[in-house]
């Protein structure tokens, strides 16, 4: 059977995906007919307006808006609460709200991690919005314990529940009274209104709620702490969607002779092996170990903006030493992390980690000819953006635009401190609470060589013809990046590899024939 290219979608047993099928002539004619029927603006007029939106006049209007947000680089609070819950053993996240919200959270994480994500909803509808959702919550808890048999339920809320003032503490008490759950069944909760804060706020308050519950449980008994020659340190990564980071924290501390307890460890729950057996609750911080966390020597809090409430709780209620650190990304960030661990635990930095540091420095030296002087724009969560900025400064790159939609009041001062420490930070402008439509104006009016951020930047990348290095959350359109660390010296090497190879790929695409070579050498290699 012979077919013409434009009709390949009609060939039996051959199904084209959306990338190809809508290029067929039949669909192209439909699109043109649709434009004509809708009396659409001429293509020339559309292009004129588009070009205008890329200029300085539109930028000024864009930055003058106050009552409109366009494409914010953030999600809502309960999404972060779900991730916090997934970091603990046998925990079922329960979101008090509509089914649609929970479907969004599950699909968002499933697309990023490529893993099934357990989460339940109280299925609030119009009736519950008017008369209250106590029956929904009680019934949900009864069904969850009967069907899914969790060890712990972590309850958060959506905007529907918050607008009508749902009282989680009272509702959970009612569930116990009505024997939907037993009197001693572990339930933590946090109020996570969607209309304030962001996913990092939700992560923080849910983690705090879980730790409060564990600290009051029967397992929170100092006599149950196992005897060990190793110092135990709590490590709190925060809203960190890099599975590889969690494993790297454990590896680093174990190399230093420290017993690490990751509080909120989703490295197994969101990266379980395909071994033929399905486990609804793989991994997570053991609840019994979490209950003993308040007896650790100290807590290392690795996201200052994200974990502010959790850090305050640990310091004030547990009376525990709380060490606030920037995310240990790059040479300086990892140096500070290892120095803090060595000081608190009274241990030495082993030779293996010193060698890893040397390899990262060597790799930076090898690649500096290609990364040095490149102008970059960075967008994402505040703690990650600060760490990324510090790393690109180490590489001799020039951060020009720094955007964080969900930045807190301390973000700008913290960022300016990082920028002022390097001559490469002199051109940078910090934009807290701005969205990706603002970033689009910035990139067109003050061009850059590279974008660094989540997949949400891909539209700017394509329109402005600027390559994107995907770092952060969410990343649906590339696979397995979250499985590798970006923290520590090893993670820094992974991130450097992404950066320099993206630049080299772009050079290959644009090189004239006389520069299109098989070997790309560093200056050191060329000299040798």
UniProtKB/Swiss-Prot annotation:
Protein name listed in UniProt: Nitrogenase molybdenum-iron protein beta chain
Superkingdom of this protein's organism: Bacteria
Subunit structure: Tetramer of two alpha and two beta chains. Forms complex with the iron protein (nitrogenase component 2).
Example of a GO biological process term: nitrogen fixation
Enzyme class of the recorded protein, top EC level: oxidoreductase
Keywords: ATP-binding, Iron, Iron-sulfur, Metal-binding, Nitrogen fixation, Nucleotide-binding, Oxidoreductase
Organism: Frankia alni
Similarity-based family: Belongs to the NifD/NifK/NifE/NifN family.
Residues given in the record as [8Fe-7S] cluster binding sites: 76, 101, 159, 194
Gene3D superfamilies: Nitrogenase molybdenum iron protein domain, Nitrogenase Molybdenum-iron Protein, subunit B, domain 4
Cofactor binding mode and count: Binds 1 [8Fe-7S] cluster per heterodimer.
Entry EC number(s): 1.18.6.1
């Amino acid at each position: 059977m012979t077919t013409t290219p434009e009709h390949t979608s009609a060939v039996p047993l051959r199904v084209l995906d959306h990338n190809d099928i809508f290029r067929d002539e039949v669909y192209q004619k439909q699109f043109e007919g649709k434009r004509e029927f809708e009396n659409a603006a001429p293509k020339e007029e559309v292009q004129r307006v588009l070009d205008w939106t890329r200029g300085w006049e539109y930028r000024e209007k864009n930055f003058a808006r106050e009552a409109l947000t366009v494409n914010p680089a953030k999600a809502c609070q309960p999404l972060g609460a779900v991730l916090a819950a997934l970091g603990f053993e046998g925990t079922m996240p329960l979101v008090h709200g509509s089914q649609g919200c929970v479907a969004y959270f599950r699909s968002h994480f499933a697309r990023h991690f490529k893993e099934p994500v357990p989460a339940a909803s109280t299925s609030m509808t119009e009736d519950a919005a008017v008369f209250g959702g106590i029956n929904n919550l009680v019934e949900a808890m009864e069904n969850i314990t009967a069907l899914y048999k969790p060890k712990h339920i972590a309850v958060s809320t959506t905007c529907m529940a918050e607008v009508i003032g749902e009282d989680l503490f009272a509702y959970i008490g009612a569930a116990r009274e009505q024997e939907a759950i037993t009197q001693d069944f572990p339930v933590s909760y946090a109020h996570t209104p969607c209309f304030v804060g962001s996913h990092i706020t939700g992560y923080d308050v849910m983690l705090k709620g879980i730790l409060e519950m564990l600290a009051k449980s029967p397992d929170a008994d100092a006599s149950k702490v196992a005897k060990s020659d190793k110092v135990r340190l709590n490590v709190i990564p925060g809203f960190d969607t890099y599975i590889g980071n969690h494993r790297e924290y454990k590896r680093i501390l174990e190399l230093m002779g420290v017993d690490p307890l990751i509080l909120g460890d989703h490295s197994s729950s969101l990266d379980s092996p395909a071994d033929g057996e399905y486990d609804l609750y793989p991994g997570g911080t053991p609840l019994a170990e979490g209950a003993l966390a308040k007896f650790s020597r100290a807590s290392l809090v690795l996201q200052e903006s994200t974990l502010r409430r959790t850090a305050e709780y640990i310091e004030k209620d547990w009376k525990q030493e709380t060490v606030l650190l920037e995310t240990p990304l790059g040479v300086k960030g990892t140096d500070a992390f290892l120095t803090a661990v060595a000081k608190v635990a009274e241990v030495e930095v082993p030779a293996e980690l010193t060698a890893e540091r040397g390899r990262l420095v060597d790799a930076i030296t090898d690649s500096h000819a290609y990364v040095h002087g490149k102008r970059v724009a960075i967008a994402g969560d505040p703690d990650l953006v600060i760490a990324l900025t510090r790393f690109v400064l180490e590489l001799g790159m020039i951060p020009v635009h720094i955007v964080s939609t969900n930045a807190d009041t301390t973000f700008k001062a913290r960022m300016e401190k990082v920028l002022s420490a390097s001559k490469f930070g002199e051109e940078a402008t910090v934009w807290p609470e701005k969205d990706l439509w603002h970033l689009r104006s910035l990139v067109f009016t003050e061009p850059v060589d590279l974008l660094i951020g989540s997949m949400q930047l891909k539209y700017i990348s394509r329109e402005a013809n600027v390559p994107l290095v995907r770092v952060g959350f969410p990343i649906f359109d590339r696979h397995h990046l979250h499985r590798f660390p970006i923290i520590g010296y090893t993670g820094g090497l992974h991130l450097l590899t992404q950066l320099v190879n993206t630049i080299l790929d772009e050079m290959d695409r644009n090189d004239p024939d006389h520069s299109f070579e098989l070997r790309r050498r560093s200056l050191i290699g060329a000299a040798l």
